[in-house]
From Swiss-Prot:
Keyword Ribosomal protein set for record: yes
Keywords noted in UniProt: Chloroplast, Plastid, Ribonucleoprotein, Ribosomal protein, RNA-binding, rRNA-binding
Main location: plastid
Compartments reported by the entry: Plastid, Chloroplast
Recorded GO CC terms: chloroplast; large ribosomal subunit
Species in which this protein is naturally found: Physcomitrium patens (Spreading-leaved earth moss)
Gene (UniProt): rpl22
One Pfam short name: Ribosomal_L22
Protein's name in the database: Large ribosomal subunit protein uL22c
Length: 118
């Protein structure tokens, strides 16, 4: 969070989301640079599973901006949105004749930063 009054930024971070970073980036790329209301509309009507945690995160970032810095939600834009890869959960799938195939369950970390339009 920056202390400059003209360029206040608020960040919300979700870690260890059980989803591939590639699939989450597909959604995050659509809302980067958009206004708060526009991002909510886009996320609500996109048919991807990644939309729900990202929608919660955008709402959390706006709530943080409203509560901590008294910024109006109508004046917020999503200045930065990024998805980083998290740790991979490694499991084994039993197969025929005593074999086991590895299963990789990826996770990701999603960061949303909002700032005032002005």
């Amino acid at each position: 969070m920056k202390s400059d009054k003209s360029n206040l930024e608020v960040r919300a971070l979700a870690k260890h989301i059980r989803m591939s970073a590639h699939k989450a980036r597909r959604v995050v790329n659509q809302i980067r640079g958009r206004s708060y209301e526009q991002a909510l509309m886009i996320l609500e009507f996109m048919p991807y599973r990644a939309c729900y945690p990202i929608l919660q995160l955008v709402s959390s970032a706006a709530a943080n901006a409203n509560h901590n810095l008294n910024l109006n939600r109508a004046n917020l834009i999503i200045s930065e949105a990024k998805v980083d890869e998290g740790p991979v959960l490694k499991r084994f799938q039993p197969r025929a004749q005593g074999r086991g195939y590895p299963i990789h369950k990826p996770t990701c970390h999603i960061t949303i930063t909002v700032k005032n339009k002005n």
